[in-house]
Amino acid sequence: MNNQNEDTEGGRNCCTCCLSFIFTAGLTSLFLWLSLRADKPKCSIQNFFIPALGKDPNSRDNTTLNFMVRCDNPNKDKGIYYDDVHLNFSTINTTKINSSALVLVGNYTVPKFYQGHKKKAKKWGQVKPLNNQTVLRAVLPNGSAVFRLDLKTQVRFKIVFWKTKRYGVEVGADVEVNGDGVKAQKKGIKMKKSDSSFPLRSSFPISVLMNLLVFFAIR
C-alpha cells in the first residue's frame, strides 16, 4: 500500500516538474521572441529635384537629379548595419500607348553604413549625367512627370554583442514632379516593399524559438 502511495506521489511530482518546465520554457521563449524581434528599416523619399524640368531656360541643359532618401530605424534597442544601398531611378515609357514599362535614367550607390537604434539616416545624392531626352519624354501635358525610385540593400541587426545574418530589403515608390522639377508632394513619400523583400518579422524570431525548443528537448 505504501509502495502504491509512493508511486502515485512520484507520478504527481513528475507531472508537476514537466508542467513547470513547459511553463518556464514557454515564458523564456516568449521573452526571447519579444527581445530578438527586429523591425526592418523604414525608407522614404524626402527630396527630389530635376533642374532640367524647371521653368528656368538656363537649366534646360542641366543633366543632374538631386535627391534625399531617409532611412529610419524603428527598433528601440537594435542597431542596423547596411550593405551598399543601390538606388535606381526610372521613368515610364510614354512613347508607346498603354505602356507601363520603366526606362532607367540613372542610378546611385550609397556606401555601407551603421545606424543606431531609433536613429534617422538622411542620404543626399546627385545622379548625373541624365539622358535629358528620356527625362523630357516623361513630361505630361500639364507639365508634371512621374518617376520611380527603387531601393535595394541587405541589412544585419546588432543585438547586444552579436550580429544577425543578412536580410534583403527591396522597397520603392513613385515620385510625381511638378512643372518646376520639384517633388509635388510636400511630405515624404513612403517607400513600400516589393514582393521579393524578406519577411523579417516572421522568419527571424521563429528560427530562434525553434532552436531554443530543440535545445531544451535534448537536455
UniProtKB/Swiss-Prot annotation:
Glycans are attached at N62, N88, N93, N98, N107, N132, N142. The keyword Cell cycle does not apply. A lipid is attached at D195 (GPI-anchor amidated aspartate). One of its GO terms (biological process) is plant-type hypersensitive response. Changing N5A: Loss of interaction with RIN4. Transmembrane segments: none annotated. It is a lipid-anchor; GPI-anchor. Keywords: Cell membrane, Glycoprotein, GPI-anchor, Hypersensitive response, Immunity, Innate immunity, Lipoprotein, Membrane, Plant defense, Proteoglycan, Signal. Residues 1-38 form the signal peptide. GO terms for cellular component: membrane; plasma membrane; side of membrane. Residues 196-219 form a propeptide. Disruption phenotype: No visible phenotype under normal growth condition. In case of infection, plants loose R gene resistance mediated by RPM1, RPS2, RPS5. Plants overexpressing NDR1 show enhanced resistance against the virulent strain of the bacterial pathogen Pst DC3000. The keyword Cell membrane applies. N-glycosylated. It is found in: Cell membrane. InterPro entries: NDR1-like. It comes from the Eukaryota. Involved in disease resistance. Required for resistance conferred by multiple R genes recognizing different bacterial and oomycete pathogen isolates like avirulent P.syringae or H.parasitica (downy mildew). Required for the establishment of hypersensitive response (HR) and systemic acquired resistance (SAR) after infection with the bacterial pathogen P.syringae DC3000 carrying avrRpt2. Required for resistance to the soilborne fungus V.longisporum. Interaction with RIN4 is required for the activation of the R gene RPS2 and RPS2-mediated resistance. PANTHER family: LATE EMBRYOGENESIS ABUNDANT (LEA) HYDROXYPROLINE-RICH GLYCOPROTEIN FAMILY-RELATED, OS05G0367900 PROTEIN. Interacts with RIN4 (via C-terminus). This is Protein NDR1. It comes from Arabidopsis thaliana.
